[in-house]
Amino acid sequence: SMKQNNWFDPFFILENLSNEEKLIQKNVKDFSDRVLRPTVVTHNRYHKFDRDLYKEFGQLGLLGSTLKNHGAAGVSSAAYGLIAYEIEKVDSSYRSSISVQSSLVIHPIDSFGSNEQKQRYLPKLISGEKIGCFGLTESEAGSDPSSMKTTYKKNQNGYILNGSKNWITNAPIADVFIIWALNEKLETNSIKGFILNKGTKGLSTSTIENKTSLKISPTGQIIMQDVAIDKSNCLENTKGWSSIFSCLNKARFGISWGVLGAASECWLIAKDYVENRIMFKKPLAANQLIQKKLADIQTEINLGLAACNLTAKAMDKNQD
């Protein structure tokens, strides 16, 4: 008899993962199905973000998972990708949230922060006790972040920040803000990163209402009006724009695994539908055109997985 086709892994990409990576994938899938899936429709409809989930993400080791210290799981890049892949099968909002926390908040503090900053912030971000966001994009500075208008001015104790950031994931619920700013002359090479804390005088957020998608994930604006911070809040080890792009590259890596998870889920829903929908006394799946579409989509998904997996291996060898 013909061997049963594994629709989801025709090129054995997932089968050739390490045992640890397979176990992580299974655990995250079980968690997603048990905890996220039952409430996802309601939470999406009512824009409800469950803050307690962050503690569960932390306990499972999903936050900052590739770090080797501060209580992080210390897993491979592919394992981090698989976390995004399985979470986004249920909802993109949860994956966005984990991506921002891991790649755009934990990563810059770990890579560019002082030892004191790492001790102060990383354990609580990794455990999910604190939530972070990443303030780069502005209403006039999206694809070209160097045209930002947010500024810092040095004073005796540190810096004064002024400006606003827009469309920021996690902003309305964040405890920790990674903010990028230029000097008052807006010189491109003056870029600096800062860590701001919720409740700092002059720092506020607003929520973007009535979004049409990613409704579980709060998105908002960050407003800074003469925010005075100590010099110990500056990420002193940033190396210009390359530091920002290292954060974005990490985030894009997680997103690329995530969208393949979403695509796999959509594919499965479509497959179940065409197998069960009877038309002219036979299932839709009996039509070759439908079969070809399913095969083509699965091929594209697996080409994506192959590329993501190769990228993961390169990242683990520091071939960024």
PLM region spans:
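Intrinsic disorder at enzyme termini
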Residues: 1-20
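Glycine-rich beta->alpha junctions and the first turn(s) of the following alpha-helix
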Residues: 13-17, 23-24, 183, 204-303
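C-terminal helix-coil-helix/basic helical segment that borders enzyme active sites and/or dimer interfaces
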Residues: 37-45, 271, 275-285, 298-320
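Internal helix-loop-helix
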Residues: 59-129, 169-176, 315-318
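A short, Trp-centered hydrophobic/proline-enriched beta-strand micro-motif
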Residues: 128-136
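Short Gly/Pro-enriched turn/cap motifs at secondary-structure boundaries
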Residues: 140-143, 167-170, 182-185, 211-218
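A structural signal for short hydrophobic beta-strand segments in well-ordered beta-sheet cores
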Residues: 150-153
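A short core secondary-structure module
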Residues: 162-205
